[in-house]
């Protein structure tokens, strides 16, 4: 079974958490694209969705699913998103697709965060296999980079990428994140940082892992 098939298994399994007549929070990325496709099969059951990226909005509309603005929704029953890494405490690194800020906004609206991944995304320590994305106001890129280097990381400017919010991304390599909650807070207090890709203050409630043996639910 290849990686895409495992992603599809996890995405399909997430449908069990979708309740009738609700608005579903939807993240972004390749695994979420599989979920949007699956959600299209039950589109008549739901009111619509709030999306964390423009790409996800477009895919939802292609499936015939109504897209709501986050400002028009007071809460969401569930938020479904993928992860670049996830640890045993259900804390994540996200932002490989540069949608981390909007993902945090939509996740904060949700009563339950469902994280869908394939088994390659599971790690013991965040930062083990994937650099930490940090969304930065463009004029602060250099000074934030110096601060990240002083904290022990190796920041790299993600060339040619502008977020949906008009900002830039620094990917921090060689950054072992042993205390995700504290590091998430510390980095978010750096002047010029919009947010960072650690999802620890608001981690996942349920993790669905696509494996060669099927979808495994961790709650």
UniProtKB/Swiss-Prot annotation:
Listed GO biological process terms: D-ribose metabolic process; pentose-phosphate shunt, non-oxidative branch
Origin superkingdom: Bacteria
Pathway: Carbohydrate degradation; pentose phosphate pathway; D-ribose 5-phosphate from D-ribulose 5-phosphate (non-oxidative stage): step 1/1
Pfam families the record matches: Rib_5-P_isom_A
Keywords: Isomerase
InterPro entries in the cross-refs: NagB/RpiA_transferase-like (IPR037171), Ribose5P_isomerase_typA_subgr (IPR020672), Ribose5P_isomerase_type_A (IPR004788)
Family to which this protein belongs: Belongs to the ribose 5-phosphate isomerase family.
Lyase recorded as keyword: no
Binding, substrate: 28-31, 81-84, 94-97, 121
UniProt-recorded name of the protein: Ribose-5-phosphate isomerase A
NCBIfam families: PRK00702.1, rpiA
Quaternary structure, from the entry: Homodimer.
GO molecular function: ribose-5-phosphate isomerase activity
One annotated Gene Ontology cellular component of this protein: cytosol
EC number: 5.3.1.6
CDD domains noted in UniProt: RPI_A
Biological function: Catalyzes the reversible conversion of ribose-5-phosphate to ribulose 5-phosphate.
Active site: residue positions: 103 (proton acceptor)
Reaction catalyzed: aldehydo-D-ribose 5-phosphate = D-ribulose 5-phosphate
Disulfide linkage: none
